[in-house]
Amino acid sequence: MRNTIEEANQAALSNMYDADPVLVDVAPASEVMLQLGEGTLLHAGPPVQWPAMCSPMQGAVVGALRYQGWAGTEEEAAALASGGSVSLQSAHDFSAVGPMTGIFSPSMPVFVVENRTLGNQAYCTINEGLGKVMRFGANDDSVIERLRWIEKTLAPALREAVLRAGGVDLRPLMAQALAMGDEMHQRNVAATSLFFRAIAPHLVRGSSQQASLSEVTDFLVGNDQFFLNLAMAAAKSAMDAAASINGSTLITAMSRNGTNFGIRIGALGNRWFTAPSLMPEGLYFPGFTSDDANPDMGDSAILETLGLGAFAMAGSPAVVGFVGAGTYRDALNYTQEMGEITLGHHPHLSIPNLDYQGVPSGIDLRKVVETGISPAINTGIAHKEAGAGQVGAGIARAPLECFHQALEALVNEMESR
């Protein structure tokens, strides 16, 4: 059995390491995610239905129903969602990932990222920027207006530029950003700048969106976290390439919906193993405390699943203070500790100040259970009430219960063959 597992893990690692994510389009979700039809919304994390959703996610669902035009008021939207008239599905089941509440609706534009090695695609919404945003559960008229601007103005300009460029290779940008101090979860300053540098010439050359070009460029340069969603889609395309390999103990997804935390492993495909989401530990913005916080949420842990975020914190000194990690020595300790539960180091994503060693990559279910070391995740902290927004940033841990469940299921699966 061990040989089978080792061979399976090597195959999964090869698929993950060889993934070549390229931004090939920016399109309405329903145009590229054909199963996302009328009456369906996607959300972050493992499956969860309306009654069990946390307040920020319920707020985002209400906002998406208004944005989509399926409800005219918050009351109508809440009645639709609570009455079962809307199908609420996990974004992961559609090869998609979304930050925080992670809500997708059919009209929302998405980044289309293709793994050119195997041909699979992954999707993520466009980052809304700062302030009052749907990913934290806000749903008033200003939020809807911004989403419609993204749909009608920003997305068409980006689509035209991406198609004119023939696609944007993301892996080289991510490698360079990592060398410049981003861990690509809570810090994307370099990655966003590099992306803008790559796309700007194509935005300004013959764009049909010339009248709104200044708005588009102002939005891009004013949002240091813009690249987050691109990094998430890139990571999803790599992890999906490593999924559904018989015998593999590689963790292919970690995700949270604000109520439950879920993981998937290579050998068991799309099956979720869940436990209650834990509270992040970190720093709170002035006026807020842990009493205001919602349990951990979002699909952005796909970055740690690949080896970025908290796993790469040794290469991102600037993020240490923001997430309350302590000193640089503490950040180094996080990266080294994560190396104890991974199968290798990513050959294309390296940390310069660790002699260009690759980030620890490929979380091994067996090592997590054997060591008792839980994967660490850099994360934003959402207010527990919809619409109040982000109240801090910190580090969350994956609940070990998920991994014990998965190992037991894997043993039962292999013994039954």
Protein language model features and the residues they cover:
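Anaerobic metallocofactor- and corrinoid-dependent redox/one-carbon enzyme cores
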Residues: 1-417
